Amino acid sequence: MSKHKNQRTASTLEKTWDTLNHLIVISSCLYRLNLKSIAQIALSVLAMIISTSLIIAAIIFIISANHKVTLTTVTVQTIKNHTGKNISTYLTQVPPERVNSSKQPTTTSPIHTNSATISPNTKSETHHTTAQTKGRITTSTQTNKPSTKSRSKNPPKKPKDDYHFEVFNFVPCSICGNNQLCKSICKTIPSNKPKKKPTIKPTNKPTTKTTNKRDPKTPAKMPKKEIITNPTKKPTLKTTERDTSTSQSTVIDTITPKYTIQQQSLHSTTSENTPSSTQIPTASEPSTSNPT
C-alpha cells in the first residue's frame, strides 16, 4: 500500500509542476502584449496553485512518516514480547539444581499457607519445595567454610566526592603501561614465593709479597765498584846486534805478547840499569880480550 501512495504523490507533483510551467509561459506572453490586468490575474492564480500543491505535499509526507513510526513501534513491541516469552520459557525449563547454592541465603522464611484454601496438589508441591530448600541449606552449610578473617563491623568510609570517585586498591600495575593515572592507583601484587638468600662465594684474595723494609736510620750499603786497571802499552825496544864476521844487522824484538803488569814494571826498571847489547858479550861471539 505504501508503494502505491508514493507513486500517486509523485504523479501529482509532476502534474502540478507542468501546470506551473505553462502558467509562467502564459504570464510572460501577457506582459509582452501589455495586458497587465490579465497577467496579474494569472500570477495570482499561479501563486494559489503553488501554495495548495505545497500544502498537499506536506500532508502526504506527514502521513507517510506517521505510518512508518507506527510500523517501528509495532516491531519493537513484538520483539519485546518475543524476548519476554523466551526468558519465561527458559526459566521454567531450567532445573533448580543449576542454581548456585552459595548465592542463596542460609536463612529462609517459613511459608504460611491456609490449609482450607489449598488443594492436595498444591500441598504436595509446597512440601516438595520445602524439602528442596532444606537440602540446599544443608549443602550450602557443608560446602561453605568459615572465614578466618575477622570482619570489621563498621564498613570503611568512602570519600565524599561529587563524582563518586573510588580508589581500586587491587589493580595490578602490570596493566597500566604508560598511563600515569593508573600507576597512581595501582599496587604491586606481592609474590608468595620465598625469596632465595644470596649465596656469598669465597673470593680468592691476592697474595701480598712481604718485603724486608729497611730502617730509615741505617744508611743503605752501596756496592763496591771494582777498579779495573788497563795495562799500559809501552813502546817496544828494538836492539840491533852486529857481528864482526858479517855486516848484516839483525833486529830482535825483546817483548813477548804475554806480559803481566808486574813484569812490565820490572822490565822497565831493568832496561834502564842494563848496558846496551853491544857491551854484553854473547855466547856465540868469541871474546876478543886476550887472557892474561
From Swiss-Prot:
Which residues are tagged as glycosylated in the record? 70, 72, 81, 86, 92, 100, 113, 138-139, 141, 199, 203, 232, 236, 254, 271, 276, 284
Q: Does the keyword Nucleotide-binding apply?
A: no
Where is the sequence biased in composition, kind Basic residues? 148-157
Biological processes annotated in GO? symbiont entry into host cell; virion attachment to host cell
Q: Which organism is it from?
A: Human respiratory syncytial virus B (strain 8/60)
Alphabetized, the UniProt keywords read:
Disulfide bond, Glycoprotein, Host cell membrane, Host membrane, Host-virus interaction, Membrane, Secreted, Transmembrane, Transmembrane helix, Viral attachment to host cell, Viral immunoevasion, Virion, Virus entry into host cell
Ranges annotated as biased composition (Low complexity): 200-210, 229-238
List membrane-spanning regions: 38-66
Q: Which residues lie on this side of the membrane: Cytoplasmic?
A: 1-37
Marked site (Cleavage) residue numbers: 65-66
Quote a single Gene Ontology cellular component term.
extracellular region
Q: Where is this region: Disordered?
A: 92-161, 189-292
Composition bias (Basic and acidic residues) maps to 212-227
Q: Where is this region: Binding to host heparan sulfate?
A: 187-198
- Report biased composition (Polar residues) as residue ranges: 99-142, 245-292
Q: What is stated as this protein's family in its record?
A: Belongs to the pneumoviruses glycoprotein G family.
Residues exposed to the Extracellular side: 67-292
List S-S links within the chain.
173-186, 176-182
Q: What is this protein called?
A: Major surface glycoprotein G
